[in-house]
Amino acid sequence: MATRISLRNARFQQLQTLLTNRNKRHRAGQFIVQGVRPITMAVEHGWEIQALLYDGERRLSQWARDVLAAHPHTEHVKMSPDLLAELAEKDEVELLAVVAMRPDVLDRIEAGPDFLGVVFDRPTQPGNIGAVIRSADAFGAHGVITTGHSADAYDPKAVRATTGSFFAMPVVRSPSPAAVISWVEERRAAGLPIVVVATDEHGDADMSAFDLTQPVLLLVGSENDGLTRAWRDAADVTLSIPMTGSASSLNAANAATVVLYEARRQRLAK
């Protein structure tokens, strides 16, 4: 039997905090997902759906009815249209999902001979995190790691920007570079020669001339400050992206996309 929310009561306020308060979101271990494709991807990839919030005053689409029917033991919450729209930050919405977070454990990322991973160091914009995740998924990466004091990958803007890719690959936060560098060294010691690759306008080599078919961990610097000294020191090579025109650099997410595409191109041609 579905519960109901028709007032801005304590439960509604708790749901709001999952959207607006990073600390409370992580304490609860939950985040809100909206949209047909993101919710479908979360279900298909086995994410734990903890509650389904839906418009209790309209006839739901077949898709929404199917999602509800597929989760009979998940909490179903009927909401008034105005409150549901407030959570979704849009007027027309029929279904939202409350999803359990997955642990920030680097071992969730599988690293084999064709490994391609991304580190996004201290990103400040949730939308850029989402864009990097989307590109990483599109071009065959095995995971994305955010490091340092950064925007939250579970921020609704970040999740929305991935258009569902967030649920298809591991996305892990590491407080500092040290844990990631240790993770790389462990895999090197086990025989996997991961190459740590940074990019810069004054790089050591053009990216198209470098072998990106080997196991690669791509470093993407903060939008404002680039990579920290720790990451610059950890990089085995710094590549440049060939550009014309007056632009001296690319947006962090765009730069990551270009290198990920080049890695995919080389691997397909191999």
Residue ranges and their predicted role:
Residues 97, 137-139, 153, 160-166, ...:
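Structured adenosyl-cofactor binding patch, chiefly the S-adenosyl-L-methionine
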Residues 1-126, 149, 193:
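Arg/Lys-rich RNA-binding interfaces used to dock onto structured RNA substrates
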Residues 69-70, 95, 161-165, 190, ...:
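Short, hinge-like loop/turn segments at secondary-structure boundaries
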